[in-house]
Swiss-Prot record:
Catalytic activity, as annotated: Release of an N-terminal pyroglutamyl group from a polypeptide, the second amino acid generally not being Pro
PANTHER family found in the cross-reference section: PROTEASE FAMILY C15 PYROGLUTAMYL-PEPTIDASE I-RELATED, PYROGLUTAMYL-PEPTIDASE I
Protein name stated in the entry: Pyrrolidone-carboxylate peptidase
HAMAP family per UniProt: Pyrrolid_peptidase
Name of the gene: pcp
Amino acid sequence: MHILVTGFAPFDNQNINPSWEAVTQLEDIIGTHTIDKLKLPTSFKKVDNIINKTLASNHYDVVLAIGQAGGRNAITPERVAINIDDARIPDNDDFQPIDQAIHLDGAPAYFSNLPVKAMTQSIINQGLPGALSNSAGTFVCNHTLYHLGYLQDKHYPHLRFGFIHVPYIPEQVIGKPDTPSMPLEKIVAGLTAAIEAISNDEDLHLALGTTE
């Protein structure tokens, strides 16, 4: 399959974003998949247009977006995105939407159509911390996953799409002893394992939910 893997620019006064750092280190061929890479702006208003133009000019079987989730201690494939922008902080264009629908004609939520449990289990099988997430937040990451679901629903019915959040890397948590992080090479290994699992046509039937 031809897979587009995206990462984000740094945001919130940081000078690095582990999502893009990890994406740049992925191999160009993973299993049977050909990998293209794209850096996305951490911008509510710009990210949709860049994705739209990229999909209009290239054929991809899969789009897999990667984002930073500071505070998480595992690599977390996302199950679902919701139709709301509700930003705790401004994006890189100083835009801070609050309680704003992403697409007025979109569904309340879009579920990733990738085998997210198989991807999660593949990460775990590498001896790495992996968990299935049921919330992509309400910042640009959720916005991006939702927009991909919207495009699949409205324009690209054969497109497969998903999102994975990754933790901080160690250099981002210097002086923050209680904040989890993960070495970049382990994030790259986890993403590689997840991408290899995308070949599964059907997801695994595993108890990877929560008790919350």
